């Protein structure tokens, strides 16, 4: 009887390799621990941290190739971008940048990686095929973030000090095509897939501002009251520092860095409407979504953790400890792992 059960178990594991103990992780969250030297890797099916990838001191940004075969990490201390093979978690290439690299983004065709160079006010453009910086673009003082929505024709980069977001045509020699001016220093940004709306976090604002890209003009601000002093994060150094569009472009989620929550807005009408706030860990300063939009993940810098949130139920499901001062994070589905499912 025992032999029969063992044989049946073996058959099940062979027919479904995803059940095997050593099966590749099919859904993985990479978390950049900005005050440390590592990326934390979380198995999203098991909802637990499984390993630490040593990457270099002060990893800043993360971006993934369209096919999820490579994740790119900017490392401030080395002034470099590292290419990580997601099937093996090995660094397969390193490209030196022209200065201190901040957040980066990949063009939808996978050909180019743009990196905001904070100390020079530029954006480096890496040719992924040649693995080198092929062009450097003017952005403005304290260049900080780059962003390209899925299927878009442009890349966007921010200058904190100039209060601007610049739009570049990556298919036309990376030409500057628009500059959008805001009324305060610009932090993170996100753009709808149709490139109609641009949303930004601004210093001093507990909420967000938005612009219409057809005109290149800021349309307004949306602000939520600050929490009472006793409920504010002691770690947070600004009101918000992270925002992202839930897949489907119907909801905008904004971190309440100071209020330990994720603020949700309905953007299907103008002006956007506040919906609710989901409580997460201390000082959430970045967030991202699963590709299907079912889950949100916040990086809680004050708690050295991430929170998994059920987007439809507006409920935090689990906190998972990671490294020191987590910030950027990215869900990845390694191609080899997908092939085994």
Please tell me what each predicted stretch does.
Residues 10-341:
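Predominantly soluble domains enriched in secretory-pathway, periplasmic, or organellar proteins
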Residues 1-7:
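Bacterial N-terminal signal peptides that target proteins for export
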């Amino acid at each position: 009887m025992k032999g029969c059960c063992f044989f049946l178990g073996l058959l099940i594991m062979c027919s479904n390799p995803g059940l095997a103990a050593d099966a590749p992780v099919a859904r993985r969250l990479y978390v950049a621990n900005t005050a440390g030297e590592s990326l934390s890797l979380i198995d999203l099916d098991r909802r637990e941290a499984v390993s630490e990838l040593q990457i270099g001191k002060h990893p800043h940004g993360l971006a993934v190739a369209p096919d999820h075969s490579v994740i790119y990490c900017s490392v401030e201390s080395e002034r470099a971008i590292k290419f990580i093979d997601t099937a093996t978690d090995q660094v397969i290439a390193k490209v030196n940048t022209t200065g201190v690299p901040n957040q980066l983004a990949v063009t939808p065709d996978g050909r180019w990686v743009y990196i905001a160079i904070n100390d020079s006010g530029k954006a480096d453009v890496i040719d992924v095929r040649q693995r080198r910086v092929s062009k450097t673009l003017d952005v403005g003082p304290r260049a900080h973030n780059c962003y390209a929505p899925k299927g878009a024709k442009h890349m966007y980069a921010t200058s904190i000090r100039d209060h601007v977001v610049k739009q570049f045509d990556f298919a036309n020699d990376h030409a500057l095509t628009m500059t959008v001016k805001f009324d305060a220093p610009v932090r993170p940004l996100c753009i709808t897939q149709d490139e109609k709306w641009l949303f930004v976090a601004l210093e001093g604002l507990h909420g967000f501002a938005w612009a219409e890209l057809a005109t290149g003009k800021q349309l307004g601000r949306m602000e939520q009251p600050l929490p009472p002093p006793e409920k504010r994060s002691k770690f947070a150094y600004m009101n918000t520092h992270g925002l992202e569009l839930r897949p489907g472009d119907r909801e905008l989620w904004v971190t309440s860095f100071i209020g330990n929550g994720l603020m949700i807005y309905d953007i299907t009408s103008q002006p956007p409407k506040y919906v609710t706030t989901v409580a997460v860990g201390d000082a959430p300063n970045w967030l991202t979504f699963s590709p299907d939009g079912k889950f949100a993940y916040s990086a809680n810098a004050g708690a050295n953790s991430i929170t998994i949130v059920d987007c439809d139920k507006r409920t935090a499901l689990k906190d998972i400890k990671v490294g020191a001062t987590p910030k950027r994070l990215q869900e990845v589905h390694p191609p080899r792992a997908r092939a085994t499912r």
